[in-house]
A protein has these predicted regions:
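Patatin-like phospholipase
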Residues: 1-44, 52-289
């Protein structure tokens, strides 16, 4: 994350987490208000969906459309899941809203030199796929949808002959991948507070049955908590050594997967804003150091 006149290259990784991503939206909006950007942003699930606005430089867009439509049955809900197989309605949430109702600024998005990558999980291999999103068009949005496709709550998303689901299954926090890109400074935005430890998936028996034809994907689901916690350990080590800068919630941002309360989304968003403002001097010092 760097201002345009700085010569150091900067990478940014955004964790997902459904509506906990409103925290990330708040952080990114404050950074945009202060003129901060980066060379390469990689996001998973909600991190990719809401990070989209960081490349298009649309302050307030993520919280605006989520508050506007979180209670709209066309946007998400059990009815959509029963009717289409997708908890978040593919046509409305991923096409009508970003293209017609609250459009992405494609001109700014495409002019922005920031490289933007989303993470998806290939259900055949169980491996993470890192896909660049240079255009912001409907094809790129399909990749965002794939990155955000929660197993069981969403059908696998077919793109170019492969099927994908939630990138968090394969790489919940893509920090190691980002470090491998070789940037001078690296920032990670988490959506869980300090001290969080991920537990084994409580519905693993059901997931084994649903995905019995995809053993590698099942293995990724089974080991997800282990990989996640190991990543947190690596981040803690790197953070202590001054190798990275981590922004994480200063208080709980726990929220239902299908939150219908705009005020609750606003609460989480404001925590992100406050944390971004509070950590801004330290972030700027890290970038300048």
């Amino acid at each position: 994350m760097a201002q345009s006149n700085m010569t150091r290259t900067v990478g940014l990784a955004l964790e997902g987490g459904g509506y906990r991503g409103m925290y990330t939206a708040g952080v990114l909006d404050v950074w945009m208000e202060h003129g901060l950007t980066c060379d390469h942003m990689v996001g998973v699930s909600a991190g990719a969906a809401f990070g989209y606005n960081f490349k298009s430089r649309q302050i307030g867009r993520a919280i605006r459309y989520n508050k506007a439509y979180c209670a709209d049955k066309r946007y998400a809900g059990v009815a959509s899941w029963l009717r289409t197989g997708d908890m978040f309605n593919a046509d409305f949430a991923y096409h009508e809203v970003p293209i017609e109702r609250d459009p992405i600024d494609l001109e700014t998005y495409r002019a922005c030199p920031m490289r933007f990558t989303c993470v998806c999980a290939d259900i055949e291999t169980g491996k993470a796929v890192y896909h660049d999103l240079p255009y912001g068009d409907e094809h790129d949005i399909e990749w965002i949808r794939a990155s955000s496709a929660i197993p069981v709550a969403t059908r696998p998303v077919a793109i170019e002959g492969r099927k994908y689901l939630d990138g968090g299954v394969a790489d919940s926090i893509p920090s190691a991948w980002l470090f491998a890109q070789g940037y001078d400074r690296n920032i990670v935005v988490l959506t869980q507070p300090a001290g969080f430890v991920k537990q084994p998936n409580s519905v693993m028996p059901m997931l084994r049955r649903v995905f019995r034809h995809y053993p590698e994907f099942v293995a990724a689901l089974e080991h997800r908590h282990e990989v996640y916690n190991a990543t947190l350990d690596d981040l803690a080590r790197r953070e202590a050594a001054g190798e990275i800068f981590v922004v994480r919630p200063s208080e709980s941002v726990k929220v239902p997967s299908l939150c219908r309360e705009p005020d609750e989304l606003e609460r989480i968003y404001q925590i992100g804003r406050r944390d971004a403002e509070a950590t801004l001097p330290a972030l700027e010092a890290y970038l300048a150091g």
